[in-house]
Amino acid sequence: MALGGEERKRRKGSERRQSSGDGVSCAASDYLVGQVADSLRGGPRPPGGGTGRLAALFSTAEPSAPPVFVPVPQETSKKRKLDDDDDDEEESVSQTKKPVLQEPSRKVKVKKLSDADKRLANRESALASADLEEELHQDQGQGRRRRSQSRGKVADGEALDVALSLAKDGGQRTKIPVNPEEERLKNERTVFVGNLPVTCNKKKLKSFFKEYGQVESVRFRSVMPAEGTLTKKLAAIKRKFHPDQKSINAYVVFKDESAAAKALQRNGAQIAEGFRIRVDLASETASRDKRSVFVGNLPYKIEDSALEEHFLDCGSIVAVRIVRNPLTGVGRGFGYVLFENTDAVHLALKLNNSELMGRKLRVMRSVNKEKLKQQNSNPSLKKDVIKPKQRLNFTSKEGKFHSKEGKFHSKNAFIGEKAVLMKKKKKGQKKKVQMKKPRKQQ
């Protein structure tokens, strides 16, 4: 390629030189002096001047042959080589950029499974699922064992929060087992305080009993929440009581038993205007039964002070308790009155059927529930009570009859007669009339 380009250049250069030499020689031989001036002046031209060589210069003669256009050759061979390299690179790039034709995908032939193959596949899947279930059960069992071990490591009597967190089940706290001996010792240090105003709080109650000893804790009871969504504990903390509630009760726990015994001196003291408190040991339950009476048929809206005034003439009263509904705080219609001695109980029993707020009271001795259970379980302790319904057997014609228990009654007792059943006639029933048959004539 490079050699052909050089030969073309040489030929073209020689042709140009020849054409330039011919033109110069022709111009020098044909030109005459004065031809240009005469043409400008417009004067008479010499004869034969029209056909001179000068006029031929301005004539438009048709070319003998059409011009030939020859492409210009490149100057250097290095540029040509570079261009060739570029062309090769472009061709390679174009070849790489051509989209690759996707080969047609081969159709996969699906084999039809036979019934035996299907059964085998089902068995394998069932076995695999059974293995997974066994692994899950094993993991759950290991988790339970770890939890039980961690619970076992917790020592008895450790923090209460840990015990409560372990006892949680489904968002509900289970009851923690209580040591009865510890509870008995705690009750000996506990004082019951009744008829407290709803405005009383823990700080006031502690300051009221601080002169007798150090107070360990205070718990409010008989609380009626103002809203149904509040619990009793939360209502006592937030001081949100029902507007109809006027008094509450509390338990005060001292650190020493001697302090609890000294605190009984506050019994009958006035903590607020119209509120005389009742103070008694929480452990004295056996002696209470002998010194207390049961009062029934009470008005539902009665207050402790009204019941206390009704029994003041019988003797000095230690405590009055009206049983109320734990949710609504309304009285259930019965209560208990505790006196200082048993002599006041005999006088209180005489107030049976007495009226209070338009109701006749029912006054009886307070009996321990455990004793009632023992009497019901032992038939020997029961009194002979005649049952209201007894079947009578009429055995003799003399008028004597006795019951199943074998007790005979007097002759004058009314025995009665056995009634004869009579069939009742239906209404509208007509008597049947017998038609006489006509005699046959002979």
From Swiss-Prot:
Belongs to the RRM RBM34 family. It comes from the Eukaryota. InterPro entries: Nucleotide-bd_a/b_plait_sf, RBD_domain_sf, RBM34_RRM2, RRM_dom. Residues 1-26, 60-157, 418-442 are annotated as: Disordered. Residues 189-284, 291-368 form the RRM domain. There is a cross-link at K246 (Glycyl lysine isopeptide (Lys-Gly) (interchain with G-Cter in SUMO2)). This is RNA-binding protein 34. The modification N6-acetyllysine is found at K153. Residues 421-442 have a biased composition (Basic residues). The modification Phosphoserine is found at S292. Residues 112-122 have a biased composition (Basic and acidic residues). GO terms for cellular component: chromosome; nucleolus; nucleoplasm. GO terms for molecular function: RNA binding. Its main location: nucleus. It is found in: Nucleus, Nucleolus. Keywords: Acetylation, Isopeptide bond, Nucleus, Phosphoprotein, Repeat, RNA-binding, Ubl conjugation.
